Amino acid sequence: MDSSNDEVLFVGTAEDEHVEMYLKAIWHIKERNESVKISTIARMLSVKQPSVVQMLKKLNQQQLVEYNKAGVFLTENGEKVGSHMMRNSRLMEVLMVSALKVEINEEMVCGIEHHMNKQFTNALCIMLNHPRKCPHNHTIPKGECCEKN
């Protein structure tokens, strides 16, 4: 069997997706100008508050958030990941509604957004003509491809 023709399958880690979901949730709460509370994150992600605390401690160690008695704040790197995830999500929603003419399926969007690299995201943004708002009328964070326009 010629191994050069074998299909290579990518298996992402659930841990990476959990990290991205937490950062996206925090980014979204911040976008709404609300203070980031453990209870709000738990409600958004349908998890228990102790799980949120455990993940925030992990994100704090990874320097993606600052988590202390003063609250929860995204670091510069955490902000980048959260913004990137929100951009992916909202561009996928625009693709579904505007280009594919299908109803938004949040479960599908969530499954895809974690696997979109910068090249794919920028190509999608260009194809969609750099949309500024998603179908829910939320701002889509700009990417490098938008800065050139």
Each predicted region: which residue ranges?
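A short, conserved structural fragment
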Residues: N60-A70
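Basic, amphipathic "hinge/linker" alpha-helix immediately C-terminal to the N-terminal HTH DNA-binding motif
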Residues: A70-N88
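Short alpha-helical segments that sit at the start of domains
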Residues: M1-K24
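C-terminal regulatory/oligomerization modules of transcriptional regulators
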Residues: G111-N149
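Short, hydrophobic-biased segments on the C-terminal half of alpha helices
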Residues: L56-K57
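Key DNA-contact positions within bacterial/archaeal DNA-binding proteins
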Residues: P50
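Short acidic, hydrophobic short linear motifs in intrinsically disordered regions
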Residues: R32-A42
